């Protein structure tokens, strides 16, 4: 069983499909929020997890106290995409407006921010960016999955959805009708002068401001299926799958 940050599930599902075919192995992916994924690792409920950030020093110390040395492999660069309903022709958004909104200040540009889960990696990323510990009381909505965010935004004007970019770059067939009703926004960095969209090229050039590294964390301590899957993702075939999925391989 591998616990996967829900915001990058499409990419890891694609990896698992190829891996299982190639090695005649069975991998069970369990999508969860970042907080739940980390809890599962700490409590030994899962030996392998995919995260959208590295472990913090404090988290590494927690593991070492349990005599566990996690093997951490950086395998891709991902991006957080901001999406809005097509009824608004405006496809631009300044990051400073998002940060002001997260601080509880009203903004003409944003009617509401929609996240997949209050404990998700997208929430913790934007909270860290805005330097806030709690979400504002008004105007922030959260659901259970990136798919629900896409559906909600496609049906509600003025809302801005915060999702993993691979939900757009590798959509499932059932999501296509909803994706037709949303625009992916170009974002202006805090000290930037231009608006940049989350394309593979812009992520590669480092110009898109909401990029993040993806890691597979292995706490199994022995060379099991998890170790094999981590090696596969970081190897040639896995890196080609990353490229095909619209994200950036690390090599």
Language-model features and meaning:
Residues 49-52, 76:
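Short beta-strand elements of ligand-binding domains
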């Amino acid at each position: 069983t591998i616990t996967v940050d829900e915001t990058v599930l499409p990419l890891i599902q694609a990896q698992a499909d190829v891996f299982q075919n190639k090695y005649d192995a069975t991998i069970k992916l369990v999508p969860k929020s970042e907080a739940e994924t980390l809890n599962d690792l700490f409590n030994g409920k899962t030996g392998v997890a995919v995260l959208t950030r590295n472990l913090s020093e404090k988290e590494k110390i927690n593991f070492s106290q349990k005599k566990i040395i996690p093997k951490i492999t950086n395998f891709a660069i991902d991006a957080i995409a901001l999406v809005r309903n097509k009824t608004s022709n405006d496809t631009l958004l300044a990051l400073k407006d998002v940060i002001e909104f997260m601080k509880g200040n009203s903004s003409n540009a944003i009617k509401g921010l929609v996240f997949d889960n209050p404990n998700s990696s997208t929430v913790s990323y934007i909270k860290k960016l805005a330097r806030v510990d709690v979400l504002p009381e008004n105007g922030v909505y959260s659901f259970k999955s990136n798919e629900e965010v896409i559906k909600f935004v496609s049906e509600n004007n003025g809302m801005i959805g915060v999702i993993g970019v691979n939900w757009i770059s590798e959509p499932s067939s059932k999501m296509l009708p909803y994706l037709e009703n949303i625009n992916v926004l170009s974002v202006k960095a805090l000290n930037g002068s231009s608006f940049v969209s989350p394309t593979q090229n812009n992520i590669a050039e480092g110009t898109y401001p909401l990029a993040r590294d993806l890691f597979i964390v292995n706490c199994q301590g022995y060379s099991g299926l998890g170790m094999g899957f981590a090696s596969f993702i970081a190897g040639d075939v896995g890196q080609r799958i990353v490229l095909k999925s619209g994200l950036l391989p690390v090599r």
